From Swiss-Prot:
The keyword Isomerase applies. GO terms for molecular function: glutamate-1-semialdehyde 2,1-aminomutase activity; pyridoxal phosphate binding; transaminase activity. It catalyses: (S)-4-amino-5-oxopentanoate = 5-aminolevulinate. It comes from Pseudomonas putida (strain ATCC 700007 / DSM 6899 / JCM 31910 / BCRC 17059 / LMG 24140 / F1). The modification N6-(pyridoxal phosphate)lysine is found at K265. Belongs to the class-III pyridoxal-phosphate-dependent aminotransferase family. HemL subfamily. This is Glutamate-1-semialdehyde 2,1-aminomutase. GO terms for cellular component: cytoplasm. It is found in: Cytoplasm. CDD domains: OAT_like.
Length: 427
């Protein structure tokens, strides 16, 4: 029995399913989840001392790679001054100033402790600002596990094959209108009929929870136009894409300005952090300035601010994102070449330093239906073959992959060598 197998058996005694987030259980790929004990640079090391090139990156935050010395040093220094104060700090203000300078749409920002908190709070704020109840989201897009958003969500909910979660009252779900991603005509039709009841449209500008589906040409532009026409707040959920697709996130990359944005993952440098913000007029409705209540004991805690500030400063250097994107492109090109050579139907998607892998004969992946038509069974086999070759991919056919600045030519070669063997075995 491996050390991971023993630990998983032990974990299941007191942790539901043996994990603290469902996708970690390997249910969609089979087998025993790996238990990691160390991570450094582009690598993770499991409890049986096997090293893997890591394309999960703690589900996105580790854009600098694991254990960047400057980030660790900033956290150590803050540790000497205490863990949390429950009071304002200079670092909170510095973080707010930096985020607002990087993301042009952000005129004001509020720190929270997770991406779920950020999206939940942004939607409450949009409802309070507009006085409307309904929200529009898109099929296969995941915005955290708050009740009103677990309707036809993506990620682990796709893996489980259910459209929503038990325990969500029907009265909550009735205010959530779910439309097809990348279908602006459906948005136009819905808003023409019920636009006066809709508080906000929330969208992942790159859908990262049905693997990685970039926006179709004109889709984000159409959302902006329709929201302006009907007085609807446009929210970009940039928990995944923020500071990764480009320094300014997907909104910077695609040139679309939302009214509100949510961030997580990278903004905390690996610590539990989220934030939401946007137009001053809307943010002025949040307590203590306005009637929309939001609070959190650990919001803006100094350890997270230290890690996040250091990370954002490091990734702001000129050329950082171009280097990341180039590695990702070279890796995906290499995978495609090896799949083609083996005669395996395979297509990749990319948005900066995030990517999707699909076992599909389609020319491109644009819709939820395209995603669901891909061969999840073949992905299972590929996942384990890549593990055998020392490469750790997301353990789900519906999760995006992530690269870091720590990935280089050595890691690229390990990845492509493992893939060549894997594709050959999948013929």
């Amino acid at each position: 029995m491996s050390r991971s197998e023993a630990l998983f058996a032990q974990a299941q005694k007191h942790i539901p399913g043996g994990v603290n987030s469902p996708v970690r259980a390997f249910k969609s790929v089979g087998g025993t989840p790996l238990f990691f004990k160390h991570a450094e640079g582009a690598y993770v090391v499991d409890e049986d001392d096997k090293r893997y090139v890591d394309y999960v990156g703690s589900w996105g935050p580790m854009i600098l790679g694991h254990g960047h010395p400057d980030v660790l040093d900033s956290v150590r220094k803050q540790l000497e001054h205490g863990l949390s104060y429950g009071a304002p700090t200079a670092m909170e203000t510095e973080m707010a100033d930096l985020v607002c300078s990087i993301v042009p749409s952000m005129e004001m920002v509020r720190m929270v402790s997770s991406g779920t908190e950020a999206t939940m709070s942004a939607i409450r704020l949009a409802r309070g600002y507009t006085g409307r109840d309904a929200i529009i989201k898109f099929e296969g897009c995941y915005h955290g596990h708050s009740d009103s958003l677990l309707v036809k969500a993506g990620s682990g909910l796709l893996t489980q094959g259910v459209p929503s979660s038990a325990g969500v009252p029907a009265d909550f779900a009735k205010h959530t209108l779910t439309l097809p991603f990348n279908d602006i005509a459906a948005v136009e039709k819905t808003l023409a009929e019920v636009g006066q009841t809709v508080a906000c449209i929330i969208v992942e500008p790159v859908a990262g929870n049905m693997n990685c589906v970039p926006p179709a040409p004109g889709f984000l532009e159409g959302l902006r136009e329709q929201c302006d026409k009907h007085g609807v707040v446009l929210i970009f959920d940039e928990v995944m894409t923020g500071f990764r697709v480009s320094l300014g996130g997907a909104q910077g990359h695609y040139g679309i300005t939302p009214d509100l944005s949510t961030f997580g993952k990278i903004v905390g440098g690996g610590m539990p952090v989220g934030c939401f913000g946007g137009k001053r007029e809307i943010m002025g409705c949040i307590a203590p300035l306005g009637p929309v209540y939001q609070a959190g004991t650990l919001s803006g805690n100094p350890l997270a601010m230290a890690a996040g500030l250091t990370t954002l400063k490091l990734i702001s250097r000129p050329g950082f994102h171009a280097e990341l994107t180039d590695y990702t492109s070279r890796m995906l090109d290499g995978l495609q070449q090896r799949a083609d050579a083996a005669g395996v139907p395979f297509v990749t998607t990319q948005a900066g330093a995030m990517f999707g892998l699909y076992f599909s004969g389609a020319d491109d992946i644009v819709t939820f239906e395209d995603v669901m038509a891909s061969d999840a069974e073949r992905f299972k086999r590929f996942f384990h073959l890549m593990l055998d070759g020392g490469v750790y991919l997301a353990p789900s056919a519906f999760e995006a992959g992530f690269t870091s600045i720590a990935h280089g030519d050595k890691e690229l070669q390990i990845t492509l060598d493992a893939a060549e063997k894997a594709f050959a075995a999948l013929k």
